[in-house]
């Protein structure tokens, strides 16, 4: 993937294709296409993305295919009666990444249930059709892409959508059920499937779907294609500051993506910045892609900070501003912090042993009688706290001079102005 990113930066393709073979439910359509920008990204590019999608669908249909203009993601795994959900993908997928770069991409999904010759033929037809459409509209689309680049450089301080309501089932918020699109907004479609049965399997003990490809059947099922933002944030007005201790790792990532940044040669004193205080962090129960992911909640707040030399400044005023925000806004689904690059920020470096905390608590009571009253009130009003010895000692540890108040602070800062 890193090698591919280098090629993307070198070539800067206007349109790319991501070729896949998928499995899942069995049905008559032999190929599905999901084109972006259509559901996300620059508004002008969305219109042209729709033109690209519809043009490809028309070409494939004229050649005998039954193409779908969306990836057929079942609302409930292995249950055709549940219908489909239109998924808007995050930037770790090609359909989420290229809109951040103001470029077009086509997710091509043929079907593993079809024979090999069919898969090759429809993939070939798609590639040729894509090239033909670029030949017809490429100059216009390229001009629009460059206009989107210029517009993206002006997005500082603007509210941006970083995630959408969808049903992609890879965990993005650990320990929480994925929210499905509202059935009240679903529409019923007639989908060309096959007859099937769902019987309890003696092997798994679960319902197993078995299709009969010799018996075509029209499925009247809900299609949840209403796309709504689920995470909207205000982009930094000036840019993001990466502290010196993370400069090498993050700088390498930024270079791979073609994002411009500036090493800070001189320290900043009392800089007016924003910092993100993490209220809650939930780690994935197991590693994914070799990393321990984390989902965060919290908020930005203004403060003054000294910034040592060696930090990186990443200006928002550049064509890849959408990608910058996707990487640095901590709640974004594929931000650097979500992928575990700043997990050290959650570690407790210092601690007070219980016997020490007991002595410190008594000394703190003597020094500040109001603290004893506050502690007594919390014991009275919070039964869970009163019954938890660790929480009671932590009450004092957090108020002691040795406590690390930078724990649960996201290390990347925002600034309202260019540095």
Spans of features found by a protein language model:
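Structured catalytic-domain cores with a bias toward divalent-metal coordination
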Residues: 1-419
């Amino acid at each position: 993937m890193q090698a591919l990113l280098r090629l993307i930066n070198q070539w800067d393709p206007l349109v790319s294709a991501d070729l896949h073979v998928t499995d899942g439910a069995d049905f008559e359509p032999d190929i599905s296409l999901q084109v972006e920008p259509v559901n996300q990204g620059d508004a002008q590019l969305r219109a042209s993305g729709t033109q690209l999608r519809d043009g490809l669908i028309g070409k494939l249909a004229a050649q005998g295919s039954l193409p779908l203009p969306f990836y057929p993601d079942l609302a409930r795994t292995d249950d055709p009666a549940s219908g489909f959900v239109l998924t808007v993908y995050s930037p770790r997928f090609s359909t989420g990444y290229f809109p951040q770069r103001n470029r077009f991409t086509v997710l091509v999904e043929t079907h593993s249930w079809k024979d090999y010759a069919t898969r090759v033929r429809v993939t070939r037809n798609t590639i040729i059709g894509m090239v033909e459409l670029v030949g017809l509209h490429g100059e216009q689309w390229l001009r629009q892409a460059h206009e989107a680049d210029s517009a993206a450089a002006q997005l500082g301080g603007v509210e941006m959508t970083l995630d959408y309501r969808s049903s992609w089932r890879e965990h993005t918020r650990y320990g929480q059920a994925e929210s499905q699109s509202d059935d009240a907004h679903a529409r019923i479609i007639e989908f060309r499937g096959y007859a099937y049965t769902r019987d309890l399997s003696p092997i798994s003990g679960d319902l197993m779907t078995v299709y009969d490809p010799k018996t075509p059947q029209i499925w009247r099922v809900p299609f949840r294609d209403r796309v709504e933002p689920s995470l909207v944030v205000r982009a930094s007005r000036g840019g993001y500051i990466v502290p010196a201790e993370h400069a090498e790792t993050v700088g390498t990532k930024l270079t791979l993506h073609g994002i411009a940044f500036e090493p800070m040669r001189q320290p900043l004193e009392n800089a007016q910045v924003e910092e993100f205080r993490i209220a809650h962090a939930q780690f994935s129960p197991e590693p994914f892609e070799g990393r321990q992911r984390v989902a965060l909640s919290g908020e930005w707040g203004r403060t003054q900070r000294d910034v040592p030399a060696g930090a990186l400044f990443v200006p928002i005023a550049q064509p890849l501003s959408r990608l910058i925000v996707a990487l640095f806004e901590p709640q974004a689904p594929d931000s650097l912090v979500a992928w575990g690059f700043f997990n050290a920020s959650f570690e407790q470096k210092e601690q007070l042993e219980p016997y020490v905390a007991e002595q410190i608590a008594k000394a703190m009571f003597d020094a500040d009688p109001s603290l004893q009253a506050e502690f007594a009130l919390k014991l009275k009003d919070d039964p869970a706290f009163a019954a938890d010895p660790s929480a009671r000692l932590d009450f004092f540890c957090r108020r002691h001079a040795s406590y690390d108040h930078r724990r649960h602070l996201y290390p990347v800062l925002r600034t309202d102005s260019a540095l």
